[in-house]
Swiss-Prot record:
A lipid is attached at residue 480 (GPI-anchor amidated aspartate). Residues 481-503 form a propeptide. It comes from the Eukaryota. InterPro entries: Trypano_VSG_A_N_dom, Variant_surf_glycoprt_trypan_C. This is Variant surface glycoprotein AnTaT 1.1. Glycans are attached at residues 113, 419, 432. GO terms for biological process: symbiont-mediated evasion of host immune response. Residues 1-29 form the signal peptide. VSG forms a coat on the surface of the parasite. The trypanosome evades the immune response of the host by expressing a series of antigenically distinct VSGs from an estimated 1000 VSG genes. It is found in: Cell membrane. The lineage of its organism: Eukaryota, Discoba, Euglenozoa, Kinetoplastea, Metakinetoplastina. One of its GO terms (cellular component) is side of membrane. The keyword Disulfide bond applies. The keyword Lipoprotein applies.
């Protein structure tokens, strides 16, 4: 009977030994001194390498959005000036003004993505990377100097536990320091991949790691297990990594990476957003207008400008927008060429100015040009009749003029002139038909029968410093500014320019 029992026991021992021989990669229950399996270490490092790049990715995204906003504000100013300087391209300039506004809004929305939880998640990624790197460097550093294959290590081969090549610097990328570059990596995918690692964290051999030694005996009394990385790994109280707990089983409730696993895909999508800008150069305009696909980007802005009534919107938008800009596939548009012909005096400081081509003007120059243009248009609008379509009768005009007693005020009206020799005070300011027909800035008139200056006579021959009060210095010549714009158009340009200045 005893012999049979001994034989049965021997068979059990042999079966266990056979199982260990056939499956050397399978770790036993936690064993004091066992190293972390290199497979698990590399999984942690792969995640860490991605996580530490998220701050660089965020910096890249914010820089793109900020640059797009700045350039689009410049494009907005450029379009506002074009609206004033190119009456024949009013719709083109207005379309680009609205398009630039949309681009500014897109850039602002991209920046606002990072005012709350998304930035916190990027911070969490960086924090988790730091935690992993330090643990991995600690484990890899606890090893016997010498060739691979020795068994005194805290980071060893999953099958056997022997020392492996050092890999933390490369796999975790711990040597980057402050030179980490953006790489558009997906933190959500990285967290998901880590959460799927099912390998037992404890290597199947080795017993020399001091970090995973028996906590209870080596420290006299250590009642609890030792969690690492918020519980992703756990050193058992009796030593070794806790059996039955892989990264896959620990990840769902792990606060270090669970939020990144659940929300990281959204963060990655926002980090990958590239905010484009409105055009500010001739080449950028060419790109935007040189193909049907690119021109389609202007449709929302053009629709907003036209506010089409039902049935009025062109069926072929591309044909319409090509006509608006004078555009052809692969060529500079007529609008872009017209902009190239505009030069404006820009202040240099100290009372000095410099004539600059519109494309070459910086935001500061464009702002000054906008302010000057608005002032010119306001002056021109103020000298226009209140109702251009209404022709006053002599009786109506005399009634209006006769109420004015001051000579300067009388002469400031485009249809009144002051007669200083008239003895009747009610008749000194009278209607001047010649002056009214010219519909230009007023001139002083001693007698109602004297001739008023025409717009051309008033401005022709004046030097640059004297070219003002309804005149405009353009192309080295003093010209009448009122012939360039009607009152209604002038006011619309002022409004558009003011809108641009508000952004």
């Amino acid at each position: 009977m005893v012999t049979k029992e001994r034989n049965a026991a021997l068979k059990i021992v042999m079966l266990v030994a056979s199982a260990l021989t056939l499956h050397p990669q399978q770790a036993l229950a936690q064993t004091a001194g066992r190293p972390l399996a290199d497979v698990v270490g590399k999984t942690l490092c792969t995640y860490s390498k991605t996580a530490k790049r998220q701050a660089a990715n965020l910096a890249q995204t914010l820089q793109r959005a900020s640059s797009a906003a700045k350039q689009s504000r410049q494009a907005q100013q450029l379009a506002a000036l074009a609206l004033a300087k190119l009456p024949d391209y009013k719709e083109a300039a207005a379309t680009l003004l609205i398009y630039a506004t949309h681009k500014i809004q897109d850039a602002q929305a991209s920046i606002e993505n990072w005012t709350g939880e998304n930035t916190k998640l990027v911070g969490q990624a960086m924090y988790s990377s730091g935690r992993i790197d330090e643990l991995m460097l600690l484990l890899e550093g606890h090893r016997e100097d010498g060739a691979n294959g020795q068994d005194k290590t805290c980071l060893g081969a999953a099958a056997g536990g022997n020392t492996v090549n050092e890999f933390v610097k490369t796999e975790c990328d711990t040597e980057s320091g402050h030179n980490i570059e953006a790489d558009n990596s997906n933190i959500g995918q990285a967290a998901t991949t880590l959460s799927q690692e099912s390998t037992d964290p404890e290597a199947s051999g080795g017993a020399s790691c001091k970090i995973t030694a028996n906590l209870a005996t080596d420290y006299d009394s250590h009642a609890n297990e030792l969690p690492l990385l918020g519980g992703l790994l756990t050193i058992h109280n009796a030593g070794g990594f806790k059996t039955g707990q892989s990264l896959q089983t620990a990840a769902p409730t792990n606060k270090l990476i669970s939020a990144l696993k659940n929300k990281g895909a959204g963060v990655a999508a926002k980090l990958a957003t590239v905010t484009s800008a409105a055009p500010t150069s001739k080449q950028e305009l060419k790109t935007l207008l040189a193909s049907k696909g690119e021109r389609a980007k202007l449709q929302a802005a053009n629709d907003e400008y036209n506010n089409w009534k039902p049935g009025a919107k062109p069926e072929d938008f591309d044909a319409h927008i090509k006509k608006v800009f004078g555009a052809e596939d692969g060529k500079d548009s007529a609008y872009a060429i017209a902009l190239e012909g505009i030069s404006i005096e820009a202040p240099l400081g100290g009372g000095q100015t410099q004539n600059k081509q519109l494309y070459s003007m910086q935001p500061k120059d464009l702002m000054a040009a906008l302010i000057g243009t608005i002032a010119e248009l306001q002056t021109a609008a103020a000298t226009k009749p209140a109702c251009p379509g209404h022709k006053q009768t002599t009786t109506e005009s005399d009634a209006l003029c006769s109420k004015i007693k001051d000579a300067n005020e009388c002469n400031s009206k485009h249809f009144c002139s002051y007669n200083g020799t008239e003895t009747d005070s009610a008749k000194k300011c009278k209607y001047n038909a010649t002056k009214a027909s010219a519909s230009d800035a007023p001139v002083t008139q001693a007698q109602t029968t004297s001739r008023s200056e025409t717009p051309a006579e008033k401005c022709t021959g004046k030097k640059k410093d004297d070219c003002k009060d309804g005149c405009k210095w353009e192309a080295e010549t003093c010209k009448d500014s009122s012939i360039l714009l009607t009152k209604n158009f002038a006011l619309s340009v002022v409004s558009a320019a003011l809108v641009a200045l508000l952004f």
